[in-house]
Amino acid sequence: MILSRLLIRHFRNIEQADLPLADGFNFLVGPNGSGKTSILEAIYTLGHGRAFRSAQANRVIQHDENAFILHGRLSGLDEESRGYSIGLSKDREGNSTVRIDGSDGHKIAELAKLLPMQLITPEGFTLLNGGPKYRRAFIDWGCFHNEPRFFAAWSDLKRVLKQRNAALRQASSYRQLLPWDKELILLTEQISQWRAEYTEDIAKDIEETCQLFLPEFTLKVSFQRGWDKETDYAQLLERQFERDKVLSYTSLGAHKADLRIRANGTPVEDMLSRGQLKLLMCALRLAQGEYFTRKNGQRCLYLLDDFASELDANRRQLLAERLKSTQAQVFVSAITSGQVKDMLDVNSRLFSVEHGKIEVKP
């Protein structure tokens, strides 16, 4: 799908905008604080139901307004592919309305299916040097798009864990947790299997793409399921009861899974410079997007905030060429047009952004 048109109302510093978008690269150029990132956030929010800089609706709705409204037109890659009209509004209480082809009552997960995207931001280093939850999210994005049953199982896992943790505080013996643990064990084992299979499938893509961006390193990825692989999870829950009761939460399981990434046998956060980490982050997102396209026949959309940050001219060119080779729709923010001039072509569009006002440049 291609996001061919984007309408924004009362989002961040953008009062109103109606943007005709290019199928290829869309460049958003302007000084810091102009609204470039707000456009990227609007696109991200349309596909995720929340902004990437803040999950709180109050922080993205314009002052003196009750809600933001986003609308997008999705076009197929050819004349035979159907298009979609999608919309999302959210008020200050966090109530969302999702609209697809004019009808309400849809779920945000449906938007995510229609508008798959990869996000690369200066804050995205957390994928590599942040906690395991960021790398779980990376794996779960792939599982969500590859396995139709994943989202329901993942939602059930969150619910059961919350209920079990509440029961832990009251339980005097492990037997009192069995009603929750029967479901928890099934969900944990199924989700862990999906995650392991996805990681195994995408590992070659990740390692080959990383080799292109960082040829001086040998990168390896491995999945850690969240407990000792030699231990039966049912037995582990019973064995951990006293410890978990003291902690008041379930300490091991699928909710503690991680993706380990090593360069020449060393954790990447201990081996790579910031510029190299950014290249690696880009490589991971590209590999995941390209794997998704190959498996699903649908192109990913890429959002790159502050494109030039941490990258020299040669690395920017390398990234731009790889993005172009995907034939995907790409949104890039930069402070000056000079940072992206070598990437402009007949299939791209340049937007000038200043004080929340957006202008298409010839």
Swiss-Prot record:
A GO BP entry: DNA replication
Record-linked InterPro entries: DNA-binding_RecF, DNA-binding_RecF_CS, P-loop_NTPase, RecF/RecN/SMC_N, RecF_2
Alphabetized GO MF terms: ATP binding; single-stranded DNA binding
Pfam families: SMC_N
Primary location recorded for the protein, binned into one broad class: cytoplasm
Gene3D superfamilies per the UniProt record, alphabetical: P-loop containing nucleotide triphosphate hydrolases (3.40.50.300), RecF/RecN/SMC, N-terminal domain (1.20.1050.90)
Superkingdom assignment: Bacteria
Assigned keywords, A-Z: ATP-binding, Cytoplasm, DNA damage, DNA repair, DNA replication, DNA-binding, Nucleotide-binding, SOS response
Positions with a binding annotation for ATP: 30-37
Cellular compartment(s): Cytoplasm
One cellular-component annotation, GO: cytoplasm
Family from the record: Belongs to the RecF family.
Function field: The RecF protein is involved in DNA metabolism; it is required for DNA replication and normal SOS inducibility. RecF binds preferentially to single-stranded, linear DNA. It also seems to bind ATP.
Protein name in UniProt: DNA replication and repair protein RecF
Source species: Proteus mirabilis (strain HI4320)
Lineage: Bacteria, Pseudomonadati, Pseudomonadota, Gammaproteobacteria, Enterobacterales
Gene (name only): recF
